[in-house]
Amino acid sequence: MNPEWGQAFVHVAVAGGLCAVAVFTGIFDSVSVQVGYEHYAEAPVAGLPAFLAMPFNSLVNMAYTLLGLSWLHRGGAMGLGPRYLKDVFAAMALLYGPVQWLRLWTQWRRAAVLDQWLTLPIFAWPVAWCLYLDRGWRPWLFLSLECVSLASYGLALLHPQGFEVALGAHVVAAVGQALRTHRHYGSTTSATYLALGVLSCLGFVVLKLCDHQLARWRLFQCLTGHFWSKVCDVLQFHFAFLFLTHFNTHPRFHPSGGKTR
């Protein structure tokens, strides 16, 4: 294991493992989740193994892992703090792909719950990264933020749309904090990355929600809205990386008042 990113990878793997253990105890079994091929516009292909029953929707999840590996191995002129933040985010992407693939493969409620739950701390991490740019290295603040993010999934136990409410709040917080960071320290380059990231996020949401409606059009009958929503999701990951690392690799735009690790 590369020592430069090994610690971050272990932290993400352990946290994800603890979430999996919690889910498999059954504490979230009452959460409303969509399970079954009928929720996807891509029709399952007879004769293919279960893990490839919807081949395009399944294989696109490899893009998360490839993106995570790519960013884990990127270096650049970064201090220990920014490198750790980058590596945690990359490890999240790397491990998120297999979780989503497991959900498609098994069509198991608990796999769907785990997929939902792990989405929240992923959206919370850019907020933590922006706080680092503004306030410096505060690991307990970042840990507290992630714990609050994970705890917010409890809303799914209280209401059928609780997860959507929690996710919406995470998206608003991430975009709002990114806008604040750009306003204080940004450039035309960071503005481009931010705009592309927000557009990718909108594409992710709209294409996923309109999966079945879009399937009426020939363009979306083979590669469906769900497939393209995952492409947009990977792109928003990538543009978030570009936006956030821009401030660490271009000292001109780095906040002058923040303490670095």
From Swiss-Prot:
Give the UniProt tissue specificity note.
Answer: Ubiquitous.
- Topology in membrane: Multi-pass membrane protein
Compartments, as annotated in UniProt? Membrane
The record ties this protein, via InterPro entries, to: TMEM187
Just give the chief location class: membrane
Q: Which Pfam families did the record assign?
A: TMEM187 (PF15100)
- Highest taxon above the source species: Eukaryota
Q: Which residues cross the membrane?
A: 8-28, 43-63, 88-108, 113-133, 140-162, 190-210
User: What keywords is this UniProt entry annotated with?
Assistant: Membrane, Transmembrane, Transmembrane helix
Which cellular component appears as one GO term in the record? membrane
UniProt protein name: Transmembrane protein 187
Upper taxonomic lineage: Eukaryota, Metazoa, Chordata, Craniata, Vertebrata
